[in-house]
Amino acid sequence: MVAKGRIIRVTGPLVVADGMKGAKMYEVVRVGELGLIGEIIRLEGDKAVIQVYEETAGVRPGEPVIGTGSSLSVELGPGLLTSIYDGIQRPLEVIREKTGDFIARGVTAPALPRDKKWHFIPKVKVGDKVVGGDIIGEVPETSIITHKIMVPPGIEGEIVEIAEEGEYTIEEVIAKVKTPSGEIKELKMYQRWPVRVKRPYKEKLPPEVPLITGQRVIDTFFPQAKGGTAAIPGPFGSGKCVDGDTLVLTKEFGLIKIKDLYKILDGKGKKTVNGNEEWTELERPITLYGYKDGKIVEIKATHVYKGFSAGMIEIRTRTGRKIKVTPIHKLFTGRVTKNGLEIREVMAKDLKKGDRIIVAKKIDGGERVKLNIRVEQKRGKKIRIPDVLDEKLAEFLGYLIADGTLKPRTVAIYNNDESLLRRANELANELFNIEGKIVKGRTVKALLIHSKALVEFFSKLGVPRNKKARTWKVPKELLISEPEVVKAFIKAYIMCDGYYDENKGEIEIVTASEEAAYGFSYLLAKLGIYAIIREKIIGDKVYYRVVISGESNLEKLGIERVGRGYTSYDIVPVEVEELYNALGRPYAELKRAGIEIHNYLSGENMSYEMFRKFAKFVGMEEIAENHLTHVLFDEIVEIRYISEGQEVYDVTTETHNFIGGNMPTLLHNTVTQHQLAKWSDAQVVIYIGCGERGNEMTDVLEEFPKLKDPKTGKPLMERTVLIANTSNMPVAAREASIYTGITIAEYFRDMGYDVALMADSTSRWAEALREISGRLEEMPGEEGYPAYLASKLAEFYERAGRVVTLGSDYRVGSVSVIGAVSPPGGDFSEPVVQNTLRVVKVFWALDADLARRRHFPAINWLTSYSLYVDAVKDWWHKNVDPEWKAMRDKAMELLQKESELQEIVRIVGPDALPERERAILLVARMLREDYLQQDAFDEVDTYCPPEKQVTMMRVLLNFYDKTMEAISRGVPLEEIAKLPVREEIGRMKFEPDVGKIKALIDKTNEQFEELFKKYGA
């Protein structure tokens, strides 16, 4: 009999109901009129305390609570792989089709598709005896993974019926088992399992087989075992954020600093505060501009975010852009290849001088902006007030801002070109129904229009009354206007205050207003014109030069230039040789079209104008005329790290990028986990995003499907299950997502697969436990976390393991758990980290200092540890090299000795050290740079097989031994440092042939022998 009760209290995600007699602990219930999904977590008499996995806003006392009689369970069967679920295993793609982009409350959908037919291949026959865990059939679920249909635990007997090979849905009965009691059990292709209950196994095996990841610092120094547990700290402080002074182009507020935008929108919706981070889900999304389908168009921003970053990266580009972002903020780079325009997202910390980042060249859209300006008109002739910003008003505005001023009762425009003043007067008559008077002063002519109302009108339109030269900025209305309106303003401004250098073929505008210069670059982008901005100091004041060059840019302003139109700013990175070969090398045809292909094959940069011609030959007109009219590849000329901590900001947009910066730049809204997911020799990957911010989770959902499985070349998603639980979802769902993920992992383990589960982040789960505990009024433990925090974390990690599975045949499967922890401010002493470290056996400590020095993976070898080294050494000794452990320990000793010596060097300098100790510093540096440092983006070095890892280590340690021998025989260290083999050792990581790496040992020995002879040692 199901329990039926009534709500008596609602406190956030917790609901208390009475009349729940007969209910059970951890029973799933439907709460309120909407039937929200909840779980009973406490029973007191007939009162039940329920944690609700959906938003409880609007749920009131008196509404019903109905039990389901079952505990929170997951469906396990074909259809799990490639799926994206929320914390309670609702398929997000299916729900999106039902309710749109936002999950409506009370909506459910089956976790596995009911109508899809799977190809079932039976593996037993009638009369066979089976027990729980036996495989009765197989389904090729994806091209990588075969799904094994198992007898559920607790069922045994004789097969009395088995389906023939064919297509079946998961609801069809595929087998019948007669139990010893005579009962017939019907088996389908899926089973349900309660998430809080461990799936059973025969025997737990010691974790003595390493989980090979191909990352040298992990496999050799801090190995993870199959069935083992590891923790890795997530990125501290902020995510992919920008400096508060970064300009953002918005429809509602014009060009505005992101920190000012945050102040305006802070709390205008659902606000969340989490330590030094806070964000608001906007009640009314605002309009920004972003890159979508090859164009820069209007997009919606749904969240604003403020956080803190311990350091920033400042980038300056050739055109004058200044970009200040967090080290892990992604910018865009790209190249044109035979496959089209390939855009890559690169973290700011991974960029270097000379790289080209994608910036905005053309911003699409615009409208006839309606003006709602009211001015007071008391006496005299009333002027007409325009109600729309059109070309004529924009032109007048250009004259006024360039050469005019607002006096208390007069609008004045100064210029010695009387025809220009007459044109402005003509416009004043047409627009405002008022005429001015042209007068001649001592040095300059002026158009004076006497009207206090007109002064007020322009003041409200954004023209400053005082110190205009230094304070003016482009009016918001102009920034969102149509291109023709923008063009009218720019041409008028240039006529007054621009200088055209016919020899250079460029227009220069000089302004004392920084905001005006940057606003100009955004206006020019509305016309598809890119600007170059330079600062110049006159006296003690800074002025800004806005330069427009290039034939096509000038043409867009109606200025013809005679002569060559090449500009070295608008360069297109092109794989010329690849495209030329694909074309069949038509040299003569290209030459007739004016394309000297050999110049570009020799390395000359191809301008955009030249690429437009080339594109016609290679069938890439769409790229030339669409994508590349909208973006520019801007070269980085300076990049530096700023170590001061500061507040940082971000916005969440539908395109996951937005246009911002001092000049229009494309800004993005993690590699270690991607490397583990791609390269670890686990067959199945489960990723749990537990309480992640929406934009971070979006990154994962977008990036994982793009990753290729390196072993098969197929999408990595074909062996992956994603569980997405974002920070703005109810906190109770974080716990459900953790248990859902581990249960799915155990299910694949039972098939005999090795599973890697990544939980990101367990810290946010712990925060949810703290909130629920507080609402339950439980006695708090350290820092407000519940007293049972340690046991909850241990319970989760203990479900990892390498086991002999249930079933008649011998199968071994494993679940390896890698949990991310996100300590506030990187504080490893806080309770979640400390309790995690008591349970896990591996800790990979990410080091921001290493990341700044571009050392990846940025795992600190002095603070990381692995307790599996002794457990996995037998596997390494038997399968790879019997000296693995001895070499690993010797290398660790060297690195630790280096750390001690560096302390001495800081005090007395390196020259005070004896030769032997300086030699240790030399070899330890080689060990760091040539072994520990690994390039995730290099085709060879991204994955290093065990045999290659050991061979590289042997080469380095042999060099160390020979160095020590040479020092003892009187050879100067400077001579050792100059040995040619050192350079070859530095390149060995990029060599796929292990035999060639091994040959470096003999080469090292030979070169040292020559040194010994030279010094008579």
Curated annotation (Swiss-Prot):
Topology term for the membrane: Peripheral membrane protein
Keyword field: ATP synthesis, ATP-binding, Autocatalytic cleavage, Cell membrane, Hydrogen ion transport, Ion transport, Membrane, Nucleotide-binding, Protein splicing, Translocase, Transport
Location(s), subcellular: Cell membrane
SUPFAM superfamilies xref list: C-terminal domain of alpha and beta subunits of F1 ATP synthase, Hedgehog/intein (Hint) domain, Homing endonucleases, N-terminal domain of alpha and beta subunits of F1 ATP synthase, P-loop containing nucleoside triphosphate hydrolases
Record field: catalytic activity: ATP + H2O + 4 H(+)(in) = ADP + phosphate + 5 H(+)(out)
Domain of life: Archaea
Main location: membrane
Any one of the GO BP annotations: proton motive force-driven plasma membrane ATP synthesis
Coiled coil: none
GO molecular function: ATP binding; endonuclease activity; proton-transporting ATP synthase activity, rotational mechanism; proton-transporting ATPase activity, rotational mechanism
Record's comment on post-translational modification: This protein undergoes a protein self splicing that involves a post-translational excision of the VDE intervening region (intein) followed by peptide ligation.
Cited InterPro entries: ATP-synt_VA_C (IPR055190), ATP-synth_a_Xtn (IPR031686), ATP_synth_asu-like_sf (IPR023366), ATPase_a/bsu_AS (IPR020003), ATPase_F1/V1/A1_a/bsu_N (IPR004100), ATPase_F1/V1/A1_a/bsu_N_sf (IPR036121), ATPase_F1/V1/A1_a/bsu_nucl-bd (IPR000194), ATPase_F1/V1_b/a_C (IPR024034)
Cellular component terms per the entry's GO annotation: plasma membrane
DOD-type homing endonuclease domain residues: 396-529
EC numbers, comma separated: 7.1.2.2
Transmembrane segments: none
Extra remark: The intein interrupts the ATP-binding site.
Quaternary structure and interacting proteins, as annotated: Has multiple subunits with at least A(3), B(3), C, D, E, F, H, I and proteolipid K(x).
Family statement drawn from the similarity comment of this UniProt entry: Belongs to the ATPase alpha/beta chains family.
Annotated function: Component of the A-type ATP synthase that produces ATP from ADP in the presence of a proton gradient across the membrane. The A chain is the catalytic subunit.
Name of this protein: A-type ATP synthase subunit A
Gene: atpA
